[in-house]
Design a protein with these regions (language model features):
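Metal-dependent nuclease catalytic cores that hydrolyze phosphodiester bonds in DNA/RNA
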Residues: 1-87
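Short, solvent-exposed loop/turn segments that connect beta-strands within catalytic domains
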Residues: 68-72, 86-88, 104, 126-128, ...
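Active-site oxyanion-binding pockets that recognize sulfate/phosphate
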Residues: 34, 101-108
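Acidic-residue sensor for enzyme active/binding pockets
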Residues: 59, 93, 114
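Conserved catalytic cores of phosphodiester-cleaving nucleases, focusing on short active-site segments
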Residues: 45, 77-104, 118
Length: 168
């Protein structure tokens, strides 16, 4: 008789924030309320997603199950966007900030980790040998955009993701 395995569910965002525990580009540092920042962020997300055109899949649900010995961990979330360019599929993670984008020299670690999780889940599901990751930062007041891109192999992502899961 099969015994029921304990299942733990966690969002991609909660997972990376728990493991990496680092500072964030936080809209609250300017005195803006969380609600206003969330509303502005939602508007910016939708605007960017519409601008990307018909080939851009917005708000794609992704989920994976990882056996962790005595229990299973279900990691799930929603990629802001998925698109293909020059034969490479990209996971797009959009972040709205109240900060001068010129001061952002590289992606915030938790933002990159979130995108890498989605990239790993999607590359595994679609059996892609490699996948692109794009972080799109948008200033919530000016709507100026800044992009960071990188490419990873499925094997690199798998190794990184399972290392993250071991820490969890």
């Amino acid at each position: 008789m099969d015994e029921m395995r304990t299942e733990i569910r966690i969002s991609v965002r909660a997972l990376v924030e728990f493991i990496l525990r680092e500072g964030d580009l936080d809209s609250r540092t300017t005195g803006k309320t969380d609600l206003l920042a969330m509303q502005a962020g939602g508007r910016l997300h939708r605007k960017i997603q519409r601008r990307m055109g018909a080939g851009y899949q917005a708000e794609v649900s992704l989920k994976t199950r990882v056996s962790m010995g005595e229990f299973d961990c279900v990691v799930e979330g929603r990629a802001d966007g998925i698109f293909a360019e020059d034969g490479l599929v990209y996971i797009d993670e959009i972040k709205g900030v109240y900060r001068d984008l010129n001061l952002i020299g590289q992606p915030v670690g938790v933002h990159l980790a979130q995108a890498l999780c989605y990239a790993c889940i999607y590359a595994e599901r679609e059996e892609l040998p490699e996948i692109g990751v794009q972080l799109t930062y948008g200033n919530l007041e000016t709507e100026e955009l800044k992009y960071f891109r990188e490419t990873r192999t499925r094997e690199e992502l798998r190794e990184w993701f399972f290392g993250l899961m071991k820490e969890y």
